[in-house]
Amino acid sequence: MLKHILFLFFTILLLVIFALGKKTHYQVVNGYWTGTVNIGKECLHVAFNLSGNGCEFDCLEQKAYGVKTDVLYRNHDSICIDIPSLNAQTKLTIIQKNGKMKGLFRQYGKSYPIEIGLNDIRTRKRP
């Protein structure tokens, strides 16, 4: 009887240890991702509406909404988006500690840092 109780106790203990030790794994998910592109001393507020294999781009300061994009690739922790009408491309990777995406926004041969986070509410704020 004591052997069964000890076995059960250690089994539960191991399950708890594995459950608590599991790292949170963030991934590129569908939704409205908002953030900023840092252009020198200025910040440009942008948004990406990811759905399925598609994506639309919004540039909030310029009031450009629903700009068509091409998703070049998308995997569990990164995405590459081409914006042909702006001659721009962005490559983003999930940051494991906070679930945001960071990367570079390239346009006309120049690169700028970009950071976006998943926004629960799709609101278009005026600058």
Where are the model-predicted features located?
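Bacterial Sec-dependent N-terminal signal peptides
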Residues: 1-28
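Intrinsic disorder/low-complexity segments enriched in polar/small residues
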Residues: 4, 97-98
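Solvent-exposed, non-transmembrane amphipathic alpha-helical segments
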Residues: 4, 75, 92, 121-123
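N-terminal helix-cap/turn-to-beta initiation motif at the start of protein domains
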Residues: 18-34, 50, 120-127
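Central antiparallel beta-sheet cores of small beta-barrel/beta-sandwich binding domains
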Residues: 27-96, 102-112
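Edge beta-strands of extracellular beta-sandwich domains
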Residues: 113-118
